[in-house]
């Protein structure tokens, strides 16, 4: 699929298909992975050459990419490199069909092993992600209320179950809040209760204290997103020179 004009988006009679080199899809991971990699590469080049173009991607098999020699953790990381984007964010957003409430979750870290997460977290990263999350949340509310999940169970329980929250996270959040007085933030919160108000807002009552949540790692954020907003959430990459989205999968 090459492109769709907005006027023909509802019921298109004709679609323009981009003709690129065929690939014989099979169970051979190197063949299939190589094809999907170069299809995405070609799509990125097309979007960069067109004014106001956007990109929608489907799922890939990360192992197939690796087997074919393309060693990227995911499409987000390849997109960032291709666009020379130094600071991108993986955000999941959905609108409740019941209440109309907007559900936003941003990941501080993305496709890395769980044991590597603490090594990647620091004050500068949290500042950057809160900037991204607040800017996105402002599209729907002028003075958003953000929640930040802790890294450890019960947000470390005052150092008993982990030191990151008391060692630097609390102070980092305080400093960011002082620089952004129009944004209300809450955290680091116990991760097991951070998304409770999201579930309520999705089903019954819109929350005025939950306009965005910052998760520390992939599964911490994606599990509640998929449980609460399955089949409705969309992944969007913040920080690219164009809009890129992907159905949550």
Where are these regions (language model features)?
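Anion-binding alpha/beta catalytic cores of soluble intermediary-metabolism enzymes, centered on
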Residues: 1-249
């Amino acid at each position: 699929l090459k492109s769709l004009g907005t006027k023909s988006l509802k019921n298109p009679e004709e679609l323009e298909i981009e003709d690129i080199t065929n690939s014989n899809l099979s169970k051979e991971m190197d063949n299939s992975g190589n094809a999907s990699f170069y299809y995405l590469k070609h799509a990125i080049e097309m979007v960069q050459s067109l004014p106001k173009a956007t990109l929608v991607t489907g799922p890939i098999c990360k192992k197939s990419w690796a087997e074919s020699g393309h060693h990227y953790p995911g499409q987000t990381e390849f997109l960032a490199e291709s666009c020379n984007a130094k600071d991108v964010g993986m955000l999941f957003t959905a609108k409740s069909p019941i209440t109309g409430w907007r559900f936003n979750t941003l990941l501080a870290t993305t496709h890395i092993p769980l044991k590597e997460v603490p090594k990647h977290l620091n004050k500068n990263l949290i500042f950057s992600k809160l900037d991204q999350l607040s800017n996105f949340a402002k599209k729907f509310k002028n003075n958003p209320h953000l929640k930040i999940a802790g890294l450890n169970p019960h947000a470390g329980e005052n150092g008993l179950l982990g030191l990151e929250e008391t060692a630097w996270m609390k102070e980092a959040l305080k400093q960011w809040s002082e620089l952004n007085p129009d944004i209300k933030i809450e955290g680091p919160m116990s991760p097991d209760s951070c998304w409770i108000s999201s579930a309520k807002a999705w089903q019954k009552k819109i929350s005025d204290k939950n306009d965005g949540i910052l998760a520390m790692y992939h599964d911490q954020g994606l599990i509640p997103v998929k449980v609460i907003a399955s089949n409705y959430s969309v992944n969007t990459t913040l920080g690219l020179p164009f809009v890129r989205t992907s159905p949550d999968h």
